[in-house]
Amino acid sequence: MIRATAVRGQHRWTATPADTVVLDFDDRHRRRMAMTGTRGLSFLLDLEQAVALRGGDALVLEDGRLVEVVAAPEPLLEIRGHDPQHLVRLAWHLGNRHLPTQLMAKALRIRRDHVIADMVRGLGGKVVEIEAPFDPEGGAYAPAHDSGEAAHGHHDHAHHDHGHHGHAHHDHGHDHDHAHDHAHGHGCGHDHHGHDHHVHDESCGHQHSHGHSHKHEH
């Protein structure tokens, strides 16, 4: 099986990709993992260390071909405040609980958590359930990744809109807020009682079919 041994950051590649992999936040942070693209290309992700991939990055195959990384939509909470000062206060409370948080100009996004949703409402915030790609802050000590290619830092991303994605079967080798055996598509049941619910993505998107990724070794 051909290997992908390097990563090119978004905006640092222009060639037409040989295939595309659609990955959720967990599966975008792997070192070694068997993957299959949306057009059927199978390969082994085999990096020197785990890299936090972002939508728009490219995996470099041994023969020089590229595989585009697309961030899959996930069940999230979008949080808004009355004004910028209120939103900063809400962000502080999320950070105080060490929750991975995506910072936006007028909103915050976190993984869906009914306990946190109730807390935010108690603080006067508005909470809406959405499905969108999740791109949280990496933290002050998260290194920019190069993995043999040019490094890139945290900046705005061109997300891709998807209605669903395939299963990524694997054992998790690192901690997550909610431990689970496998990531499931968004047709699976989520409890939405007591919440407003709609699906949207503020970023530009184009449709992809969805491939599968299988854990090989972490």
Curated annotation (Swiss-Prot):
Region (Disordered): 138-218
One GO BP annotation of this record: protein folding
Record field: compositional bias (Basic and acidic residues): 172-205
Pfam families in UniProt: UreE_C (PF05194), UreE_N (PF02814)
GO cellular component term, pick one: cytoplasm
Biased composition (Basic residues): 154-171, 207-218
Localization (cell): Cytoplasm
Source species, domain of life: Bacteria
MF (Gene Ontology): nickel cation binding; unfolded protein binding
Keywords, ordered alphabetically: Chaperone, Cytoplasm, Nickel
HAMAP family per record: UreE
Family stated for the protein in its record: Belongs to the UreE family.
Role summary: Involved in urease metallocenter assembly. Binds nickel. Probably functions as a nickel donor during metallocenter assembly.
Protein name (record): Urease accessory protein UreE
Taxonomic lineage: Bacteria, Pseudomonadati, Pseudomonadota, Alphaproteobacteria, Hyphomicrobiales
